């Protein structure tokens, strides 16, 4: 048996792991048993990306949700009757917390009586076997897989199997849902389930789908990774009319959906995890007029605030584009700061639908050039600190100034950044040290002096030889000229000798 807890922890993002641990902690404090269920477990065993964290507790999930809210989570919607809470957890993770329950039908097709139950009863009352799997997060059974309907086998066979013959009768919206799961996962519908599906269509059960249930499926499609495949499957089975007759007549805007899906891939490549529900909803309804779009959302059970946000999304995005291409955004750093705060779904919408080259070039620069520079900014801070600048307000300002210069192409090398940092911080370069001349050793000094004396004697001897050769060439013996000091004594000696000879003759 695989170690599902190890698989889960190795596949979770750090933010998702923190959420899971916090929910475990709160559940234990309240005395609730807690389980990961539904899509989270299904995506885990199929190897798909874990988009949401779905928790089921044997207790009231509202208490946990409101405690999480204190730590930064946001409650998106809460159904008190079903005890189901949609949550945007801290760390920007989506998910839900539900109470374990059993739906008791007096007869097929009637409204169920809700009873709070154990996890096993909750799994057995679900729509399809691939959604009826759970992993325990409780201390005594942590990592234990619960699969009472043999959903793992159906996943291995790549089949979507309903759990009861009354599945579509009790909840006709499952006609849309079974096609959505099959299209999303590339699965086929199990044989008996297909027979029940065909029988339900023959009985026109699709016409009994409530607007609220249809709206729920419309929201789900907007969050799908392959929305076009799901919508086409609905159209092939004439089920799009159950969502809305006008949409069925005019058809979804598949070209707009395709553009948005391409943008979604680009954002994933750039390191984002975009939630594109609003722009995708507009893309699905793209062929409808504004009034028709509003009518579809109203009939689909969208709350007024939710509907206004969706219908006003395009206008808000175009206003943002107008500001982005304005004069105030000429500097790259100003455009970066603006785009950094702009909601990602608006950026995606502009990438898919804008025809303004100036806006698109700035968005591409933001995603592919400016953000990597921003992510490398801690290196600049480290370099400034190494120069001796203490951290503080001025320190942060200098780092931001360097970032602004880097967006213009300056400060690419470490040497260039150091010059910029010194100039901005006022830290001067240390004075260069002069190299002292090395004194030779005493023995070496004497050797040099002796060599110098030898050279002088050699030169003097060579000069004398040259002088002798010159005199020999003239026929005169070469005689060294006496020094002036010695001339007088020689002359005096000659006079004395002459005087002696003179006396002798006399």
Task: Set out the residue ranges of the language-model regions.
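Catalytic cores of the polymerase beta-like nucleotidyltransferase superfamily
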Residues: 1-506
